[in-house]
């Protein structure tokens, strides 16, 4: 009996596992992307003789091109050529349809009770589906490619209980900022974070992804939500795999945080740290050069819908540019069918191919010296999007859209109210 993390490890090993134990387990999936695969391949090569020169299972080994796709430099193109060669050699399919943390779940590779390791810190996103998923260094991932196994010290668990209801203009992203503010950027170091409470139980899978994605911003080893009927409905048609619907049983949490969502308002994470969180009213009127809507945190269809609703029929401020990057091909096509992409383009935004976009500061919208951006990313570290003197503010998709219209950080509630009024008039 224990936390969801303990239940997953116990189920996997066929015995009771407790926090603090060091265990070796078989993993269900191993993933790396275009910037982390080269070192993982090097580590794999060193073990190639022991593994017969083959990955443990090519159907459970995944390489995703998302960080710099299409290649923006000769160096990136060369690395991608070499990764493709390795993938052909190992019969691994290279996925090129969006961000790894969106594409892996969409393809049904993530199911409740699974253990997944990825060469990216935001692999914890998959915990929204009831999996234990964590980021590892490329060397560890290379070993996992070779053996299909890895070791863990089963982490202790922090519980974040969220109750109440979302106020007007407040979204899952705003709640994550409040979490990071309370817990701190290192308050959950090597801890699992389990999100519970009445509000969590009513969230969509997309909103749950936002929560679990930012577990690492508190130092979390993993972020998890107990799977339920909402999880099963989302997975229906995506996988035929059987999976256990595990849940905590008399869990012993190291610490419990309580958040009443009803008391929140739109929040902003100010540079240079994610836990530098303030109510939006404290920073309105700060001029913004670029707005970026997308990433594995907020590049999903509901995020695009919120922003498109605010931008519909309007024009982006002339002093501000806007970049929109859907998280996956599936989302891109759905947004195109629903007219969201047309709305963005008519408003003056640049819509880019699915991927990470300017999130890591390599291409597709990097910042010049002294510029400011408002983005839906998960990080605002110095130099994250370009020049180290540039500043990055983080907000919700609604805040991003409102800011793009005003040319400065803006409270989205005014625009949301206008949109609601216009819809009401249209139906009368």
Question: Which stretches of residues belong to each language-model region?
Answer:
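Fe-S-dependent hydro-lyases/dehydratases of central metabolism
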Residues: 1-428
